[in-house]
A protein has these predicted regions:
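Alpha-helical transmembrane segments and terminal signal-anchor/GPI-anchor hydrophobic tails
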Residues: 65, 70-73, 199-201, 206-324, ...
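Short hydrophobic/aromatic helix or loop-helix immediately within or flanking a transmembrane segment
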Residues: 70-106
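Loop-to-helix entry region of an early transmembrane alpha helix in multi-pass inner-membrane enzymes
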Residues: 92, 104-121
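Transmembrane-helix signature of polytopic, membrane-embedded enzymes
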Residues: 124-143
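Membrane-interface alpha helices of multi-pass inner-membrane proteins
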Residues: 146, 177-201, 312
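Short acidic/glycine- and proline-prone juxtamembrane loop motifs at membrane-interface regions
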Residues: 151-157
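Membrane-interface transmembrane helices that cradle and orient dolichyl/undecaprenyl
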Residues: 163-177
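Signature aromatic-anchored transmembrane alpha helix within multi-pass, membrane-resident enzymes
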Residues: 218-219, 344-366
């Protein structure tokens, strides 16, 4: 019973976000039918504002939910107690924001709520021209494969979501806005400089590429990741990890240097990762035609495709090697929202129900596995949602 109670906030928040997004999309469609024009409701409609506030509240009220929560909480509380930081190597921008909130005497819920509000604002603003996705975003983000990443990697996922409204600038190769964003992002998480590499990646793909082309690339990455012996020389290059800001994880790569790899079994979680990757790749050609007027669809697909290829290429290594892909996982969430919207539009109800059920079972299975297979008490499981004991 305790397990279900602690899991319910995920479901309730996801369903409310779905209802708000669905209502906004429905109102916009009615307005277009009435005016016979491609008019849009403002992105700051009450449903979007309510969604942002709900995500902020969801972030604010959590307590020891997410693997890194303890570190951020302890830093904040110690800063309020004696003005020092438990972890001294945090980035200057992140430290500045933390100090501004901590030294005003605010409760730590305000601190976590601020980051949740910032993330939600960037996500909804970045998708302001794609409001039909709003209803699906909440479901996939809270119940899908990357919810735990979002709740755990606070700094990295803040930058990842802030990158969403910047995609048009990267797609059009606007150098100065891209550079300015990267410089600001680096002050929140050092590894964000990796995003500048995307400036040189053609995000708008050729329209004549077939489904088999993308499946072949994904298959190669998947097979190479099955037994990554080719990684041993890379893992021994200390300068490489220092360059990308992961030098503190160097000790974790010793098993790779000695060719002791981590072979992950094909349980339900691994299969869901594989299913979602194949799903949006398989339907990409059809969706490309359906969303032909969507100027950012191809860019979103490219970023999601690179993300899942990278993930499966390194999935049998230490997780620190997969961490750079966290900047791209938000686009997998967006692509799954596109897939669900596409299924609804062409009335593929069976595929919509099956795929939505599979994808949105990930958080539940993760929590269930932690409690019932790893025998952790529900109160100690940092994947379940725990409310702060008192305000």
């Amino acid at each position: 019973m305790e397990f279900l109670i602690d899991f319910c906030p995920y479901v309730i928040a996801a369903l409310v976000l779905f209802a708000l997004g669905f209502n906004l999309s429905r109102r916009e469609n009615k307005m277009r039918q009435a005016t016979h024009a491609a008019v849009s409701l403002p992105w700051y409609s009450w449903e979007a504002i309510a969604s942002i506030l709900l995500i902020a509240l969801f972030s604010a009220l959590r307590y020891y939910t997410g693997n890194d929560y303890r570190m951020y909480l302890t830093n904040f509380q110690q800063l309020q107690a004696d003005g020092s930081l438990l972890r001294g190597n945090l980035e200057i921008g992140f430290v500045l924001v933390t100090k501004l909130i901590a030294l005003t005497g605010c409760h730590f819920s305000v601190y976590f709520g601020f980051w949740g509000a910032l993330q939600a604002f960037c996500l909804y603003y970045g998708l302001r021209h794609h409001k039909q996705l709003y209803c699906w975003i909440g479901l996939v983000l809270l119940l899908g494969p990357f919810c735990i990443n979002w709740l755990t990697y606070l700094r990295q996922w803040t930058i990842a979501i802030a990158f969403v409204p910047m995609v048009p600038y990267f797609a059009r190769r606007k150098f100065w806005p891209c550079l300015l964003f990267t410089l600001v992002a680096v002050t929140i998480h050092y590894s964000a400089w990796i995003l500048m590499l995307l400036y040189f990646v053609p995000l708008v793909l050729k329209a004549d590429r077939s489904r088999n082309f993308y499946l072949a690339i994904f298959a190669v990455c998947y097979l190479l990741g099955t037994y990554p012996v080719w990684l041993s020389p890379i893992a021994s290059s200390r300068w490489l990890f220092s360059l990308v800001g992961y030098d503190k994880y160097q000790c974790l790569f010793q098993p790779l240097i000695e060719e002791h790899f981590v072979f992950k079994g094909y349980g339900p979680l691994r299969l869901i990762y594989l299913f979602q990757s194949l799903l949006f790749i398989w339907y990409y050609p059809a969706m490309r035609e359906y969303y032909s007027r969507d100027k950012l669809f191809n860019a979103f697909f490219t970023l999601a495709f690179v993300g899942v290829c990278y993930q499966h290429l390194f999935i049998n290594t230490v997780y620190a090697l997969i961490r750079p892909a966290d900047y791209l996982f938000i686009f997998v969430v967006i692509m799954m929202a596109y897939v669900f919207d596409y299924f609804m539009a062409i009335k593929k109800k069976f595929m919509l129900c099956v795929s939505c059920l599979v994808i949105c079972s990930f958080t539940f299975i993760s929590c269930y596995k932690e409690v019932y297979f790893l025998c952790k008490p529900a109160a100690e499981c940092n994947l379940l949602y725990h409310f702060i004991p008192q305000l």
